A protein has these predicted regions:
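A membrane-topology feature that recognizes alpha-helical transmembrane segments
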Residues: 1-346
Length: 346
């Protein structure tokens, strides 16, 4: 009974964090658009997706090189600075500008800058699991909102499709994401959601003891893993190996879920809310039927993914999550009266 409660608690916390990222991104869509934060001139251009995928490949190669050269402090510093920047984007549109000051003719929101600095400092001095997770929700919603208003429907679908394929190859094929995962786990940076399985769990105390032998993926782009799992056991057993020889998920203190697993499908949700020509369902948040069904499709994919992971094996996350987001979006778009051509952004 206790093990069941722990598992249900972990699943509930994971679903809650994904939902916060998605609802946060939807809430940020219109403020980001009004603030002029759209990142490209032509959001409908499919080449935007190719450029982003290329950037992902370059960034992955750079991170692997940093790990190989044993200069992980560069990666940690870069992620902390990026987290502060993304936090500023979010805080700049949600915090009142009452304390704004003028610098070179432009208004600067002092509260937003202070809050963003607080996020970076917290990551630097006390990267406990709740700091990592809270930061992940903030920057995940911000990143998804920014990309959502910058990628039209077709570019978003192409982006999610290509990244899902890349994720599967990098986890099950080349396995270079496994190297990246094991290299970033000790850095205590918000590239993963840390889901504790016990109330007493401390990410700081876990340190090298639980992560040093980790061979499972928990990376910036995708993949889901548990704290001490390996893709195969020391004898080379694969997914068909008898259940008794697999690690027991209930023996672990935490599971780790890549932040990208929450961000990438949410790009589709935000893009649907911004670009799909459907009637809004509620006021105060960018939510229409295609965005809602995309959100529900993501959640369905997440539950299937967690069911697979809780069996004790690591899995690529984006095939299920992105597939659910795209499939859910298309169902909602067609149900709202759009033609398939319109739904695909053609």
């Amino acid at each position: 009974m206790e093990d069941r409660t722990r598992l249900l608690g972990a699943v509930g916390l994971t679903v809650a964090m994904f939902l916060l990222v998605q609802l946060g991104a939807l809430a940020l869509v219109e403020p980001f658009q009004r603030a002029g934060y759209q990142q490209v001139e032509n959001p409908s251009d499919p080449t935007n997706s190719l450029l982003y995928v290329g950037a992902v490949l370059v960034l992955t190669a750079a991170m692997l090189a940093i790990i190989k050269l044993d200069v992980q402090w560069l990666l940690r510093g870069g992620i902390i600075l990026t987290s502060g920047l993304l936090s500023w984007y979010v805080f700049s549109v949600v915090m009142p500008a009452g304390l704004a000051v003028t610098v070179d003719g432009a208004a600067v929101n002092v509260l937003a800058i202070g809050a963003a600095l607080a996020v970076s400092v917290a990551l630097l001095v006390h990267p406990e699991w709740y700091v990592i997770d809270a930061t992940g929700v903030i920057i995940g919603a911000g990143a998804a909102g920014l990309f959502g208003i910058s990628f039209g429907l077709l570019p978003a679908i192409l982006l999610l499709g290509v990244l899902a394929i890349y994720d599967a190859i990098s986890v099950y094929g080349t396995e270079h994401m496994l190297t990246l995962a094991s290299g970033v786990m000790d850095l205590k940076i918000p590239v993963v959601f840390v889901v504790p399985m016990t109330l007493s769990y401390s990410y700081l105390d876990a340190g090298d003891d639980s992560d040093g032998d980790d061979d499972g993926p928990a990376d910036t782009e995708s993949s889901v893993d548990d704290a001490e799992d390996a893709v195969a056991n020391p004898d080379g057993a694969d997914a068909d190996h008898p259940e008794a020889e697999r690690p027991d998920i209930t023996d672990r203190d935490a599971i780790f879920i890549g932040l990208g697993d929450a961000v990438m499908p949410t790009v589709m949700v935000a893009s649907a809310a911004f670009f799909a020509e459907a009637e809004p369902l509620v006021s105060g948040i960018a939510l229409n039927l295609p965005a809602l069904t995309s959100l529900l499709g993501t959640m369905a994919g997440l539950l299937v993914l967690l069911w697979m992971v809780l069996k004790g094996r690591a899995h690529a996350g984006l095939p299920l999550l992105n597939g659910g987001a795209i499939g859910g979006y298309l169902i909602g778009a067609l149900a709202s009266g759009l033609t398939l051509t319109q739904a695909l952004g053609l």
